[in-house]
Amino acid sequence: YNRRFFRGRDDVKPAPKVYAIMESNDIEKNHLQFFGTSMPETERTKAEKQIKYLLQTFVDAREYGSILNVDVCDWELLDRFVNDLNDNGQVTFESLGSEETHEKLQGLIKIAKVMSKKYDAVVINPPYMGASGMISTMIEFIKQNYNNGKSDLFSVFMLKVARMLKNNGYASMMTSYTWMYLTSFSKLRGEMLE
């Protein structure tokens, strides 16, 4: 226990990773042609493929929030790709807004990097919402990604936390105790015991 944790030490201060989920819906995909132009073709192709994956993953991301599953990417490569913006000093109709796309991609990469990591400890107070209160796209997303926790949003977060932890990591959650005995949570219990 360290009551001065948030003050840090002389050279080390804690840096919480708190972000608002960003959507990729309004990122102009045609601008990708202006990024990574000085990179070797194989690296550029790999980076573009990973950026397109992130853009697809973050479509309507505000609907799903932190239950999105983000694969680990080559973050250093993506940083180089996004920071290599070349519009030849000319603003054309095609390149108009590429600086804004640059900023959005940087933010998206930052959030994706945090969401893809594994952590030693995860502490949450998940939202509570039964399936009857969810919109159809959320229900479909949960069935595809968290089927054993589809009874309630808090059980989805329980599964998400389990995926976010390193081996032998610690989790702390404020959840309803009903998951321990209701039959609708039996598959969740089975997965949590694995």
What do the predicted segments below correspond to?
Residues 1-193:
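SAM-dependent methyltransferase catalytic region
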